[in-house]
């Protein structure tokens, strides 16, 4: 779902009381009405037939991006993806997840450093990065654009310490994204 971060728990009546006691107040604060409203809009979108197409486009985009990274020598946990994200092991190209995250961020590409299965590194400086395609898909990007995004990721990672590469890619991305504005912000 697009929209604010939040969670909902669906349960049976006989479990509701225990669940309420477990979650609130210890694990959850008070409800924020703007978050509840945002999630309501998201659930409304999910009821529309176009949401199924959007969800499939996210997966299609992730698979093309994953293939692009694999072809470029990046290892992916599970060898690819069948959902909206992928977990890339960047150690074979001499990087850590933290270094990769920082280099990509300087270039205008947002990923999260992330541990990989059986990671020997510490959580704050793991071996991988997590990459998703939901935001790109929301902006209207398709599989052709994912090939370009994959090329940018590879270019930045191969020159992670070279800030001029990051600056060049950042400028290219800014120009590229002008054709894919964030919905509702124009």
Predicted regions and their residues:
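Generic non-transmembrane alpha-helical segments
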Residues: 64, 68-72, 99-107, 152, ...
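Conserved PLP-binding catalytic core of the aspartate aminotransferase-like
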Residues: 75-140
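Composition- and surface-driven signal marking solvent-exposed, interaction-prone regions
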Residues: 22, 54, 82, 100-102, ...
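Short, well-ordered loop/turn and helix-capping segments at boundaries between secondary-structure elements
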Residues: 11-13, 25, 45-48, 92, ...
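Hydrophobic transmembrane alpha-helical segments of multi-pass transport and channel proteins
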Residues: 30-31, 111, 140, 160
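Solvent-exposed alpha-helical segments within well-ordered globular domains of core cellular machineries
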Residues: 17, 67, 102-105, 151, ...
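PLP-dependent enzyme catalytic core of the Aspartate aminotransferase-like
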Residues: 60, 123-186
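Active-site C-terminal subdomain of aminotransferase-like
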Residues: 1-96
């Amino acid at each position: 779902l697009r929209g604010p971060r939040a969670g909902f728990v669906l349960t049976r009546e006989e479990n509701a009381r225990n669940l309420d006691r477990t979650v609130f107040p210890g694990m959850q604060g008070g409800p924020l009405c703007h978050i509840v409203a945002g999630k309501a809009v998201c659930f409304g979108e999910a009821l529309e037939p176009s949401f199924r197409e959007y969800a499939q486009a996210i997966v299609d985009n992730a698979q093309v991006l994953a293939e692009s990274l694999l072809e470029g020598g990046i290892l992916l946990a599970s060898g690819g993806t069948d959902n909206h994200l992928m977990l890339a092991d960047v150690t074979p190209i001499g990087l850590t997840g933290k270094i990769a995250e920082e280099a990509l961020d300087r270039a205008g590409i947002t990923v999260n450093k992330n541990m990989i299965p059986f990671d020997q590194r510490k959580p704050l400086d793991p071996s991988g990065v997590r990459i998703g395609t939901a935001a790109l898909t929301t902006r209207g990007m398709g599989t052709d654009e994912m090939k370009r995004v994959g090329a940018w990721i590879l270019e930045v990672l191969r020159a992670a310490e070279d800030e001029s590469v990051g600056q060049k890619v950042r400028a290219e991305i800014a120009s590229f994204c002008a054709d894919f504005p964030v919905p509702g912000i124009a």
